[in-house]
């Protein structure tokens, strides 16, 4: 899920920022400034891209989550008690603290109006995708907060057939964001 596991056993987010990005910058001829870096992902990776952009707003100029796995507290509680119980308890722990620190909706809702992230967002989710409600909640919070974003709901579900049609638009959006910087 691209987060640091609550018990510290799997520090995925730390690894991404402390090891992977420095390795990429050292190994390849890439620019290391925020204006030249975007993040995108689909499903669980969409959640990760949202989260990384919110935890590290100084690192990215654009974020493009597709069909992001964003859940509110009620969905999360239901999932902890059902089929995904082992997974979610392993990631977020038995309490709510780690969940709150990694809840995209809560982070956005709590964001200081005077210190909004200077990141352009492109959010895309299919109308038949079970994750649409969470993505719509993100859109509503962003509108209320005045966070710049594009929000697309198109015909389709949670599948590569859907995402393949979104990727050209995502690349265009990221390219335009780089050009503006």
Can you name each region flagged by the protein language model?
Residues 1-181:
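Non-catalytic cap/lid and distal C-terminal segments of serine-dependent acyl enzymes
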